[in-house]
Swiss-Prot record:
GO terms for cellular component: cytosolic small ribosomal subunit. InterPro entries: NA-bd_OB-fold (IPR012340), Ribosomal_uS17 (IPR000266), Ribosomal_uS17_bact/chlr (IPR019984), Ribosomal_uS17_CS (IPR019979). This is Small ribosomal subunit protein uS17. Pfam families: Ribosomal_S17. One of the primary rRNA binding proteins, it binds specifically to the 5'-end of 16S ribosomal RNA. Keywords: Ribonucleoprotein, Ribosomal protein, RNA-binding, rRNA-binding. The gene is rpsQ. Belongs to the universal ribosomal protein uS17 family. One of its GO terms (molecular function) is structural constituent of ribosome. GO terms for biological process: translation. Part of the 30S ribosomal subunit. It comes from Prochlorococcus marinus (strain MIT 9301).
Length: 88
């Protein structure tokens, strides 16, 4: 069985070792044939906390890692120049 892969944008990096990735799926409406965009948000495992808000990433399907996490970051395609703030 082949593992599923998706390409999306990181929309949240507030959790430890987890990011939320928004994937936009475009498809024609079955009746009206208009191109419809649907956004799906996946929680993905980021073990080194390397992803920041706005990064374009590739995620792959994996075993369940928690109650909601079934995807893992495979690679960062486009890195944003946004630096993380250090909390004191």
């Amino acid at each position: 069985m082949a593992l599923k892969e998706r390409i999306g944008t990181v929309v949240s990096d507030k959790m430890d070792k987890t990011v939320v990735v928004a994937v936009i799926n475009r498809y024609p409406h079955p009746t009206y044939k208009k191109i419809v965009s649907r956004t799906t948000r996946y929680k993905a495992h980021d073990p080194e906390n390397t992803c920041v808000l706005g990064d374009r990433v590739k995620i792959r399907e994996t075993r369940p890692l928690s109650a909601h996490k079934r995807w893992a970051i495979e690679e960062i395609l486009n890195k944003t120049s946004q630096a993380k703030e250090v909390k004191k």
